[in-house]
């Protein structure tokens, strides 16, 4: 179905699905906490699966791989220890180097360091959209989890303010600048590294899901901003 032939209601449902998936990915790439394994409980995962299906994609098998992996452990606490260990190895302290740094500046900036020019650019886009960094977020603004959450926020704000044409136009430009000019330029390389180097199914599967979704996002944005 082309964008031109969709009804307003269909476009809104697609936007909701996109926001749900970005929020889910943000949660998966955040530092693991006690609630993360529970994200895959049957009742909680259904919203994600429905959103995935609405976009014409199938995540059932991928989610089953994660839930099967989680059931190997006697409880969520044990699974969480494994997630925390792998998160640290992939994103923080692997030797001799971090295999998948989760920051845009490492991929977009010539220096390939954290807290680079791209970090400041991401923070400026957050500010332009009226969003500040939460006091509960203890990382760098261009962390992949923060950027996925920001993408979800932009889409949700457009839905909430759909009767405010000025706000919608501003958010649409920010979304274009952020997704096309920033997130989609570096996330594929990052996700490829995660899929290649992760030693547990959780991050392998989530990285593959994110890559599949972002291919669809690229196609969607090319149509919208043709």
What are these regions (language model features)?
Residues 1-226:
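Charged, alpha-helix-forming regions
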């Amino acid at each position: 179905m082309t964008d031109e032939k969709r009804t307003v209601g269909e476009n809104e449902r697609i936007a909701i699905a996109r926001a749900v998936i970005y929020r889910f990915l943000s949660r998966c790439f955040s530092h693991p906490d006690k609630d993360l394994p529970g994200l895959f409980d049957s009742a909680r995962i259904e919203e994600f699966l429905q959103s995935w299906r609405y976009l014409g994609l199938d995540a059932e098998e991928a989610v089953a791989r994660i839930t099967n992996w989680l059931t190997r452990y006697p409880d969520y606490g044990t699974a969480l220890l494994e997630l925390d260990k792998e998160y640290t190895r992939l994103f923080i302290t692997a030797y001799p180097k971090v295999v998948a740094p989760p920051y845009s500046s490492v991929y977009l900036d010539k220096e390939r360091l954290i807290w680079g020019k791209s970090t400041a650019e991401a923070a400026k886009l957050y500010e332009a959209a009226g969003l500040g960094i939460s006091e509960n977020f203890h990382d760098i603004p261009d962390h992949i989890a923060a950027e996925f959450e920001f993408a979800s926020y932009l889409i949700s704000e457009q839905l909430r303010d759909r009767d405010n044409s000025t706000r919608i136009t501003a958010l649409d430009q920010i979304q274009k600048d952020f997704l096309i000019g920033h997130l989609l330029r570096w996330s594929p390389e990052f996700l490829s590294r995660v899929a290649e180097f992760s030693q547990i199914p959780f991050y392998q599967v989530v990285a593959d899901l994110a890559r599949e979704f972002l291919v669809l996002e690229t196609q969607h944005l090319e149509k919208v901003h043709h």
